């Protein structure tokens, strides 16, 4: 058996359809897109300024078009199909929502995915989806999302969905306990990703929270399944994150991780995740 840790190589801030093949060609097996809302309606994949150093912050697409394009890349038999593209993270910019818009926004994202990505359950895209929310207070989003899939008779698609409550960032990131509580309120037990990190121009810091999260993931009663670190663009940072035990790297340069995974000392411990790797399964250190 292959006992190496499977690694998700997440291309950061992929918001225009033309960027999808470019990042996959660099070796990404997963993509992250930013979802911007108008009211409670997910309307664009768009980040805006400021963003990571060296990146064009204003590339965008209509959300429905973006999802249909993701579907093409992840549906076997499609001319654009890529076997290695196995997961995408939707970075949901729910900070713009009022409290009473949070649940409807979750319902709307579910409807969009159901129609434009999953093709109403009829041979849609096969990639796994992580819903990343910037505020642990927005757990109603997840409840609304799940409710729609149940109502529409597609509860089975929740097998393909994971969750990442990543903030708020200010005044400081929530504790792991507070994050765990939010998941309970969301009715989520399992399929949990945790992200930790900084913009690519921040000094790296001591990875203290990352190490704490990994310790929690690996503990007997840990609630986290996978941990990814962002934005990791240098060989040295990539190695440091792998050494600590992350499951994923979010990067502006997916080719960097591909290079590291070929190196002695890394190629025997880590490998690029494939579709057969379950993203909701904990791989302990």
UniProtKB/Swiss-Prot annotation:
Its EC number is 4.6.1.-. Mg(2+) binds at residues 32, 34, 91. Expressed by the venom gland. The active site is at 12, 47 (nucleophile). Its cofactor is Mg(2+). Its main location: secreted. Binds 1 Mg(2+) ion per subunit. It is found in: Secreted. It catalyses: an N-(acyl)-sphingosylphosphocholine = an N-(acyl)-sphingosyl-1,3-cyclic phosphate + choline; an N-(acyl)-sphingosylphosphoethanolamine = an N-(acyl)-sphingosyl-1,3-cyclic phosphate + ethanolamine; a 1-acyl-sn-glycero-3-phosphocholine = a 1-acyl-sn-glycero-2,3-cyclic phosphate + choline; a 1-acyl-sn-glycero-3-phosphoethanolamine = a 1-acyl-sn-glycero-2,3-cyclic phosphate + ethanolamine. Signal peptide: none annotated. It comes from the Eukaryota. Keywords: Cytolysis, Dermonecrotic toxin, Disulfide bond, Hemolysis, Lipid degradation, Lipid metabolism, Lyase, Magnesium, Metal-binding, Secreted, Toxin. Belongs to the arthropod phospholipase D family. Class I subfamily. This is Dermonecrotic toxin LlSicTox-alphaIII1ii.
């Amino acid at each position: 058996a292959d006992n190496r840790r499977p690694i998700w190589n997440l291309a950061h801030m992929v918001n225009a359809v033309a960027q999808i093949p470019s990042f996959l060609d660099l070796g990404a097996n997963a993509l992250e897109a930013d979802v911007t809302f108008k009211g409670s309606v997910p309307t664009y994949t768009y980040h805006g300024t400021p963003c990571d150093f060296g990146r064009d912050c204003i590339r965008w697409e209509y959300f429905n078009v973006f999802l249909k394009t993701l579907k093409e890349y992840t549906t076997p038999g499609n001319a654009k199909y890529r076997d290695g593209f196995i997961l995408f993270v939707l970075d949901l910019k729910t900070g713009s929502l009022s409290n009473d818009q949070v649940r409807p926004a979750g319902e709307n994202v579910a409807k969009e995915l159901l129609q434009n990505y999953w093709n109403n359950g009829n041979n849609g895209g096969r990639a796994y989806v992580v819903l990343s929310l910037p505020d642990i207070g927005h757990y109603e989003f997840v409840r609304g999302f799940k409710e729609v899939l149940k109502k529409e008779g597609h509860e089975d698609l929740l097998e393909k969905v994971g969750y990442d409550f990543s903030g708020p960032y200010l005044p400081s990131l929530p504790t792991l306990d507070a994050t765990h509580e939010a998941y309970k309120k969301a009715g989520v037990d399992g399929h949990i990703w945790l992200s930790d990190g900084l913009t690519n121009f921040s000094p790296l810091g001591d990875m203290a929270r990352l190490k704490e999260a990994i310790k929690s993931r690996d503990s007997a009663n840990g609630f986290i399944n996978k941990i990814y670190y962002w934005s990791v663009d240098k060989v040295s940072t990539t190695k440091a994150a792998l050494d600590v035990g992350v499951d994923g790297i979010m990067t502006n340069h997916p080719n960097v991780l591909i290079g590291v995974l070929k190196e002695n000392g890394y190629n025997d411990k880590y490998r690029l995740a494939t579709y057969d790797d379950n993203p909701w399964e904990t791989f302990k250190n």
